[in-house]
Amino acid sequence: MSEGPVKFEKNTVISVFGASGDLAKKKTFPALFGLFREGYLDPSTKIFGYARSKLSMEEDLKSRVLPHLKKPHGEADDSKVEQFFKMVSYISGNYDTDEGFDELRTQIEKFEKSANVDVPHRLFYLALPPSVFLTVAKQIKSRVYAENGITRVIVEKPFGHDLASARELQKNLGPLFKEEELYRIDHYLGKELVKNLLVLRFGNQFLNASWNRDNIQSVQISFKERFGTEGRGGYFDSIGIIRDVMQNHLLQIMTLLTMERPVSFDPESIRDEKVKVLKAVAPIDTDDVLLGQYGKSEDGSKPAYVDDDTVDKDSKCVTFAAMTFNIENERWEGVPIMMRAGKALNESKVEIRLQYKAVASGVFKDIPNNELVIRVQPDAAVYLKFNAKTPGLSNATQVTDLNLTYASRYQDFWIPEAYEVLIRDALLGDHSNFVRDDELDISWGIFTPLLKHIERPDGPTPEIYPYGSRGPKGLKEYMQKHKYVMPEKHPYAWPVTKPEDTKDN
């Protein structure tokens, strides 16, 4: 029986490429500190930041990162901050020349020698734009790869621009790293409620038994952002909302929602089932997609997407999209799975909504459908909307809920941030929450025909919707077309998803 993956614990070397960038400043270094603060990153770990910017460690890198470090224990965490920065060194170097990487190798080997490391454990985090990713990967392999140890490489999205570019990237990476050395990170897989999906589904018989076409009428996966591109239009214009969040984040949620029970919770069993369900996804109907682009707010205070100076005034970039997936297998055939995502909407949230079929007619002439709602962010919660008799002498019914609100139920728990979870998983050698090469290939195969349809010269023109609205006017009709029953007739008090002043007894 083979042993599990090697855990990186004492005297691990972590190198963060792109250390001067926003991702490293706001996510990578704060995640490393969070793990250290909570005792999940050994103090013997050595962290190297590497970037082209000529920064000093004390005045520049530290001052950039410090405002983003969370200190839940107040002043008690100040000493942890100082200890953490003593673990960090910074190296300035180009990505396409050897000198900087030679210096990094020298510093790594010096540390490992002083720590009497026999089998090097090296984790490389590529917080880099796609344009330099392959260049750095080649330098890692030729200059700092642990030939007599274990190397792991965390890769940030985007993993390609379409199916052809993703395959080209995989082709170029193949000679450099084994699949088990690569950790393609999608941070949504580290979010607490996304990680909880398999337990909710398969650890509760009443949910597991009803999670199928016999009981569920429709499924929605929604991503809403209150803000627009805010000066990033030039970058977003070549990406669009589909590549930004749907081909990756939301599709990952969909696979966990719809996959079959794995034979075990080991990484490959989970990823095998994700691949199986992706293979059952029917091609997207390009004529059954709702596309939008935000215009000015109705009061004129917020600009339109094309008002961004970095965006072409004739841009047809999609900032809102809604589409429906059909999974051709025994569990899901006939159940529309709607995915929608947009910027500059009326609120910011990510949620999953499973609407159950209506009860048989008879004593109940007009009663709402049950819904299971999983709020990923903000204010993580799970609640089941169901019908109950209104208190009193009447036999009237009302919609109420059973709800699990994380902020009140788990007040005394440390709930790690997504990047903390995933970096920890990489250190442990756990691939469960990372994207495998065949999974990536199939996901691009699903979306690339739609992207080509949208981006051809005579492609569809997105519907303009006001900044701060719910999205294109056709959204309600689109949802109803795909079997979602609007609950407009039935008043409902949404559960409180923020901690209250008093704890439950």
Curated annotation (Swiss-Prot):
D-glucose 6-phosphate binds at K157, H187, Y188, L189, G190, K191, E225, D244, K343, Q377. Keywords: Acetylation, Carbohydrate metabolism, Glucose metabolism, NADP, Oxidoreductase, Phosphoprotein. NADP(+) 1 binds at G18, A19, S20, G21, D22, L23, A24, K25, R52, K157. PROSITE patterns: G6P_DEHYDROGENASE. It is an enzyme of class 1 (oxidoreductase). One of its GO terms (cellular component) is cytosol. Signal peptide: none annotated. One of its GO terms (biological process) is glucose metabolic process. InterPro entries: G6P_DH, G6P_DH_AS, G6P_DH_C, G6P_DH_NAD-bd, NAD(P)-bd_dom_sf. SUPFAM superfamilies: Glyceraldehyde-3-phosphate dehydrogenase-like, C-terminal domain, NAD(P)-binding Rossmann-fold domains. Belongs to the glucose-6-phosphate dehydrogenase family. Catalyzes the rate-limiting step of the oxidative pentose-phosphate pathway, which represents a route for the dissimilation of carbohydrates besides glycolysis. The main function of this enzyme is to provide reducing power (NADPH) and pentose phosphates for fatty acid and nucleic acid synthesis. NCBIfam families: zwf. This is Glucose-6-phosphate 1-dehydrogenase. It comes from Saccharomyces cerevisiae (strain ATCC 204508 / S288c). The gene is ZWF1.
